Design a protein with these regions (language model features):
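Mobile "lid/hinge" segments at catalytic clefts and subdomain interfaces of large enzymes
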Residues: 186, 200-352, 368, 470-493, ...
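A charge-rich, low-complexity, intrinsically flexible signal that marks solvent-exposed coils, linkers
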Residues: 932-964
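Segments forming glycine/polar-rich beta-alpha architectures that bind adenosine-containing cofactors
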Residues: 656-731
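Long, structured ligand/cofactor-binding scaffold of large enzymes
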Residues: 51-258, 265-270, 374-377, 396-521, ...
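Terminal amphipathic helices with adjacent charged low-complexity linkers/tails
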Residues: 79, 97-152, 288, 293-420, ...
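Extracellular/luminal Protease-associated
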Residues: 289-296, 560, 783-784, 788-828
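Acidic/polar, glycine-rich intrinsically disordered N-terminal extensions of enzymes
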Residues: 1-79, 121, 656, 660, ...
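Acidic, glycine-rich flexible loop/linker segments
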Residues: 603-618, 831-908
């Protein structure tokens, strides 16, 4: 359709492209020129996708008429141009697609209809772990272990590559997904002939993306609109379903000035994160503008976009300008692409110049870049920024809250990785066999460890390794440190994990590799590593000392997240910082230090060496960038990015439309999501009655708390399951690598070693009380008993529930444990969407209320009244429900709001989840689901409207309820 007459043509380089011209709307009385850049991208998407059903003329008029201060409940359908995956979320996504093919066949449909209609690119980056370090052999050892542990998963992804159209895989140890996206995959302007499923004339349109990793907005720095979604939402997008959303608020972030001497892009993004968390931008778009844009390199912009989830925004976008074009050329994009980007963006009024009118925004915030100062963030949250000079004071203040709570379980390091230094030579050539550890020694001395000792120093994460300025600053600092005679402290596990092989090339060109090597920062792999918790084990002596003395050890990393329990189970305090500061803290060996006033150590002349003595100047950094970083490095590195090495290509790969599931596999299992599914959706959604609380939690519960990605303990439910299946602890691998096996993942849900459940006082880790007997046991074991009793479950939490990673297993796991309802003070955007997409009802306390103010103990039974009726009426009477909590002290009643936010989400929930909705759509061939009628129903604890099926050792809710 073309209701507004915007279809036109654009000729660039002798080729003609069909486009939908935004300026043409002015002729219809709608002028998008003052809309935020991000909303203009969405507007073009609606114009191009208009079909009168999914996208209507009224949708287009509503978005084109957006103005600050207007509150709209208009739902729009955004169709991303492509989907981006990483392997931890990508494997379960492909597992789900394979299971959908089986279900499609079982229900009489064509399994080939389960096929991506949008281009899908998966980068394997989340699996490699830092087993070996500080050694010339570290990379080869870690790569060997990576293939040994994950070969079955990689073969499964190679099956997916041949079984599905429009699906490409970047092999392991190539780079980090967001850096590869920034440097190579992102087009800025997409053409429809790049989509194998596209038909009709070749169209040109803005590159847009959704990704199964919350840091997908890194590409916003390039002017590409995109954000993170849960795996199931990404699967729906692959299969042609739009992303349903309300027209967002857009917060303008005005930048002025320029970064001062000594401040880095990392310091800037930590400052932005602190400011925007205080501002409150959850679920909103953030858009950067102002005179300060011109002073920021593209890599600096990408760093800011990368941490969008840390400050809660859906995206954090910069407009396309001359800086963008220079970066595209510099990273080796074809000149034809750059010419198309320039011509298209200028034609559409999307190209930013100094003369561009300032857009209108819902709200604004401002930062003078000149005020940014060296910073770090920690010990638990990215928004908790600390001035570098106050690191020691801040740590000592936080220390009481970091001291361990005794767990019921025997203390042990996570298994599934090679244990101790002897296995992999982690101490490296010329390093001590192990540090000398003596009780009572002061941190930062050779005498031993104490609270505040830095035991991990990792240059890691695409947030910073995509930025040549901060990476070369780290190399220059290392060079000066070596020349002064400094060494890293012997208890520090140091590592360098670039997000692209380009980094290695420019380090070599700058002659800095040898200095980093000398300080123990050898390359350990090209992947996420420490940033996502794949830090590997600490040397045995270090780990044992920390555990025996209950020390608060520290990780210093150039990552984007520092949630408790994320980086390493032996580490209780995690600090985010720039790469050069990571090197500095490796030299100091402790966090409780003022680097402005205290020396890093003594030089070879015996004199103290301070940070100021080795910190590189801006002029030194810029000169090194100009000299060492070359465009050819990008072209040559990415020329064969999809090809893989001999190990990748020699892997045996299964073939066929259907995947041949191995019943004994502990990595890839047929999930139970479609068991018992019928072609028709259930008529009603039952209310929940007689529910028990599985957990009562506090604020800032992350998806890492809910579904950890790191090591698996031998005595945990998941560890016991693997042992029963014949897997030794050395081969456990990580939870993240086991996401293709629901049996492992349901057992690992709420198993984070740092989670604290009020219902199991005095414990730390995944414990709860099974109230019928009063026994304290693991969350998983209690969930099995409750499901056997037919008791639905509730999780109660505080503010920012589900913050952090986009992982859908933080919703899948609770659902498979029998959780029907979550009640929280507030939700992070992606997790709330994932809960709905899995059939869990998200309820939100009324403003100013929480579990404590209402007087909930978590020991009550809970009835949710009115949800079935409200959902059946599409919330015509409002979204509020009544919750009755019955306990020994009587009954408490409170109101809560249903957080099913869009009409499309109502359909997902009614169908029992997004995957069933999509499968039924493909079976019926309908563009839109029929309205589902029927009155309210009730599911009681005896399960009168739900069946329970058995799958392996775990009971799962019936497939045709909103659960599964």
């Amino acid at each position: 359709m073309n209701s507004f007459g915007t279809r036109g043509t654009l000729e660039v380089g002798g080729r003609q492209y069909e486009i939908f011209r935004l300026p043409a709307l002015k002729e219809r009385g709608m002028d998008p020129a003052r809309l935020p850049y991000s909303l203009r991208i969405l507007l073009e998407n609606l114009l191009r996708m208009e079909d009168g059903v999914t996208v209507t003329a009224a949708d287009i008029e509503a978005l084109a008429g957006w103005r600050p201060g207007t509150v709209s409940d208009r739902e729009i359908a955004f169709m991303p141009g492509r989907v981006l995956l990483q392997d931890f979320t990508g494997v379960p996504a492909v597992v789900d697609l394979a299971a959908m093919r089986d279900a499609m066949s079982a229900l009489g449909g064509d399994p080939r209809r389960i096929n991506p209609l949008q281009p899908v690119e998966l980068v394997i980056d989340h699996s490699v772990q830092v087993d070996a370090f500080a050694s010339a052999e570290a990379f080869s050892i870690n790569e060997e272990l990576d293939y040994r542990r994950n070969g079955e998963r990689y073969a499964f992804l190679r099956w997916g590559q041949q079984a599905f159209d429009n699906f490409r895989v970047v092999p392991p140890n190539t780079g980090i997904v967001h850096q590869v996206n920034l440097e190579y995959l992102a087009r800025v302007v997409f053409t429809s002939d790049e989509n194998a499923a596209a038909e009709g004339p070749v169209q040109a349109y803005p590159d847009t993306v959704v990704g199964t990793d919350s840091h997908t907005p890194m590409v916003n720095g390039l002017g590409v609109l995109g954000w993170g979604v849960g795996g199931i939402e990404a699967e729906a997008a692959m299969l042609g379903q739009p992303v349903s959303m309300l027209i967002p608020d857009v917060v303008g972030f005005r930048l002025s000035g320029a970064l001062p001497e000594g401040a880095t892009a990392t310091d800037l993004v930590l400052t932005v994160t602190e400011m925007l968390r205080k501002k409150g931008v959850v679920g909103k778009f953030v858009e950067f503008y102002g005179p300060g844009l011109a002073s920021l390199a593209l890599a600096d912009r990408a760093t800011i976009g990368n941490m969008s989830p840390e400050y809660g925004a859906t995206c954090a976008i910069f407009p396309v300008d001359e800086v963008t074009l220079r970066y595209l050329r510099f990273t080796g994009r074809p000149e034809e692409r750059v010419a198309l980007v320039e011509a298209y963006m200028k034609e559409q009024g999307l190209f930013h110049t100094a003369d561009s009118p300032e857009p209108l925004f819902s709200d604004t915030i401002e930062l003078d870049l000149d005020t940014v100062e060296p910073s770090l963030a920690g010990p638990r949250r990215p928004q908790d920024r600390i001035r570098l000079s106050e690191a020691g004071v801040s740590f000592r203040k936080a220390l009481p809250s970091l001291l361990p709570t005794r767990s019921l379980t025997q203390k042990e390091a996570p298994t599934g990785v090679a244990a101790g230094p002897d296995a992999v030579g982690v101490w490296g050539e010329g390093s001590p066999d192990s540090p000398s550890l003596e009780n009572g020694g002061a941190s930062g001395t050779a005498g031993g460890l104490t609270n505040g000792s830095v035991v991990i120093a990792a240059i890691t994460s695409c947030t910073n390794t995509s930025n040549p300025s901060v990476m070369l600053a780290a190399g220059l600092l290392a060079k000066k440190a070596v020349e002064k005679g400094l060494t890293r402290k012997p208890w520090v596990k140091s590592s360098l994990a670039p997000g692209s092989k380009v980094v290695t090339r420019y380090y070599e060109a700058a002659d800095l590799t040898r200095y980093l090597d000398e300080l123990g920062f050898q390359t350990v792999g090209y992947g996420c590593t420490t940033c996502i918790g794949n830090s590997g084990p600490l040397p045995t002596a270090i780990s044992q000392e920390i555990q025996d003395r209950d020390l608060v050890a520290v990780a210093a990393l150039s990552g984007n997240r520092n949630f408790e329990g994320r980086i390493n189970s032996d580490v209780r305090a995690n600090y985010l910082m720039s790469p050069p500061l990571v090197v500095a803290f490796a030299l100091a060996g402790r966090i409780d230090i003022n680097l402005y006033e205290e020396p890093l150590g003594s030089g070879k002349d015996g004199k103290p060496v301070f940070l100021r003595d080795i910190w590189p100047t801006r002029a030194e950094i810029e000169e090194t960038v100009q000299r060492a970083v070359r465009s050819a490095m990008f072209r040559e590195t990415y020329a064969a990015v999809f090809n893989g090495d001999e190990r990748w290509n020699s892997m045996p790969v299964p073939a066929g439309v259907h995947f041949a599931w191995e019943p004994d596999s502990t990595y890839v299992r047929l999930p139970p999501y479609f068991e018992g599914m019928t072609r028709e959706a259930p008529r009603t959604v039952p209310d929940v009655t007689g529910a028990r609380a599985l957990l009562l939690l506090g604020d800032s519960i992350t998806t890492d708390h809910i579904s950890p990605a790191g090591g698996i303990k031998k005595d945990s439910p998941a560890g016991r399951y693997l042992v029963e299946k014949g897997v030794g602890p050395a081969d456990f691998n990580s939870y993240g690598s086991r996401r293709g096996n629901h049996e492992v993942m349901v057992r690992g849900t709420f198993a984070n070693t740092r989670i604290r459940n009020v219902l199991a006082p005095g414990t730390e880790g995944g414990f709860t009380t099974y109230f019928p007997t009063g026994e304290v046991m693991t969350v998983y074991d209690a969930s099995v008993r409750y499901q056997a009793d037919g008791t639905p479950l509730v999780v109660i939490a505080g503010k920012e529930y589900g913050s952090g990673s986009s992982r859908d297993w933080a919703a899948k796991g609770p659902r498979l444990q029998g959780v029907h309802v979550a009640i929280a003070e507030s939700y992070e955007r992606i997790h709330r969407s994932n809960l709905v997409g899995l059939g869990i009802l998200p309820l939100q306390f009324m403003p100013g209320e929480n579990a404590a103010s209402i007087g909930l103990t978590g020991r009550e039974t809970y009835d949710v009244e009115g949800a079935s009726r409200a959902i059946a009426a599409n919330f015509a009477g409002g979204r509020e429900v009544t919750v009755r909590a019955r306990g020994e002290g009587g009954e408490k009643t409170f109101r809560a709001t249903i957080r099913i936010d869009t009409p499309q989400e109502v359909l997902y929930y009614r169908h029992g989840g997004i995957l069933k909705y999509v499968l039924r759509q493909l079976l019926s061939g309908k563009e839109k689901a029929e309205a589902i009628s029927g009155g309210p129903a009730t599911a009681n604890k005896n399960g009168t409207t739900e069946a329970v099926t058995q799958n392996s050792a775990q009971s799962f809710p019936a497939s045709d309820s909103p659960a599964y």
